[in-house]
């Protein structure tokens, strides 16, 4: 991988991490189309630290408030004493499924599940599920029922959205896509579903990035070229990730996820056609 490729992949990671179109799919598809080769699951996990930093900075006020409330609640012996503390523990509970599945199926995630057949099926599959979720949201709104706020989430909501997040381990599904979809099914409004999705991503993205960084440390340190590529890609992911968060939260205040559904369907079907005609290797 050269520096130009690293920059492009970092930009792609940042732009697609928070949109419900799957960053892992695009980091698999673009190199395949350009003839660059698969950058690998480890590269993807490490540059996600850049998008993690984007979430930390964008939601700094919320994160400080939630973390402070959790610590204060533990000190006072009232761990669920405030809405912020309760949200913090819900994020922790919602993180458990992806940790369990991620460690259990780590080998499969890094090998067979990166097939473009899997990616295309995931792109199309989640698009169809998201259609149903949007229909559910429209029915709720038509009945005059408002969406839940983050403070109104139940433990069942947190577990179900957490289980949905575990599906993001399959390339093409999209972390934000599956968690926003789960949130819509649990009667969150679109913006709240996206906000909780981003906060929920923090523990798992940090853990995955640190694990891959530790496991590949010798390979990274063996070459300043590798270090530079990772650093540049991570910085690009941070910049464009921050912009992507701001865009999506503002967009979902007034729009449905319809444009992303259409994009996923077109890309998924296009992949199948290109693979079937021999223009792209799976």
Swiss-Prot record:
Topology relative to the lipid bilayer, per the entry, is:
Multi-pass membrane protein
The UniProt entry, under NCBIfam families, shows: PRK00281.2-1 (NF001392), undec_PP_bacA (TIGR00753)
> Where is this chain's protein located in or outside the cell?
Cell inner membrane
The protein's role, per its UniProt record: Catalyzes the dephosphorylation of undecaprenyl diphosphate (UPP). Confers resistance to bacitracin.
| Primary location recorded for the protein, binned into one broad class | membrane
Q: What is this protein called?
A: Undecaprenyl-diphosphatase
Tell me which Pfam families the record gives.
BacA (PF02673)
Task: Give the InterPro entries listed for this entry.
Answer: UppP (IPR003824)
């Amino acid at each position: 991988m050269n520096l130009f490729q690293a920059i492009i992949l970092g930009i792609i990671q940042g732009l697609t991490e928070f949109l419900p179109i799957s960053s892992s799919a695009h980091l698999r598809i673009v190199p395949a189309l350009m003839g660059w080769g698969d950058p690998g699951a480890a590269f993807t996990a490490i540059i996600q630290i850049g998008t993690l930093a984007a979430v930390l900075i964008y939601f700094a006020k919320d994160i400080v408030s939630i973390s402070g409330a959790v610590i204060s609640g533990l000190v006072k012996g009232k761990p669920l004493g405030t809405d912020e503390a309760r949200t913090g523990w819900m994020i922790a509970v919602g993180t458990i499924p992806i940790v369990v599945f991620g460690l259990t199926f780590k080998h499969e995630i890094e090998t067979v599940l990166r097939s473009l057949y899997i990616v295309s099926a995931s792109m199309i599959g989640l698009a169809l599920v998201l259609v149903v979720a949007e229909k559910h949201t429209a029915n709720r709104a038509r009945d005059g029922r408002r969406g839940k706020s983050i403070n109104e989430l139940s433990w069942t909501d947190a577990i179900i959205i957490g289980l949905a997040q575990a599906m993001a381990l399959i390339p093409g599904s999209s972390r934000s896509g599956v968690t926003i979809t789960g949130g819509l099914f649990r009667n969150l409004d679109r913006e709240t579903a996206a906000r909780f999705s981003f906060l929920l991503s923090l523990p798992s993205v940090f853990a995955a990035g640190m694990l891959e960084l530790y496991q590949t440390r010798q390979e990274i340190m063996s070459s300043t070229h590798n270090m530079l590529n990772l650093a540049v890609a991570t910085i690009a992911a941070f910049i464009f990730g921050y912009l992507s968060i701001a865009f999506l939260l503002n967009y979902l205040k007034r729009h449905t996820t319809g444009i992303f559904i259409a994009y996923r369907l077109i890309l998924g079907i296009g992949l199948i056609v290109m693979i079937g005609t021999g223009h792209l290797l799976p």
